[in-house]
Amino acid sequence: MPDPGTTAVVIVLPDAAPLLDAAWRIDPALVRHGVPAHVSLLYPFVPESVLTVQDETNVRSLAASFPAADLLLEHVVTEPGFVAVSVPELQPIVDAFHGQWSGLRPYGGRFGARPAAHVTVAMGADDPAAAAHVRAAVGHLLPLRTRAAAVQLVVLAEDGWRPRFTAPLGGPDGA
């Protein structure tokens, strides 16, 4: 678990909640409690202790430069201990955030220099049978339509992740 004050920039996808619910029904330990379905644009982001107004302005500006998008989630991805659903339509915004803050290594470098845009469904699925069960349950829910409407900067507090601010995609009105 990361330390309090860790931040992330994400796109929350409320319509994808059933994917996490399916994994939770198989094993609640596989789903991070209190973390909604989302695509991480940059994690970890600038630590809260050194986060500046300029960083926040840059997040808002970059979010405004991308339109809101209707998404079709179709493909389950599995790696050892990990089940996700790919979201290739959001790769350009993920890449833009990585480019804007090129000194930050996504996921601390654990998944390479350019991790694919995805919704994490289950983490810690080290038992291959459990991972297969999650993959099958999630696969039955796809395809799933959702909409990316805003970017959110979140901060880890002692009691879990909390939003710091939300910036609409496509400008002030989210168009």
Regions found by a protein language model. Give the residues of each.
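A short, structured active-site edge motif that brings together acidic residues
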Residues: L73-V77
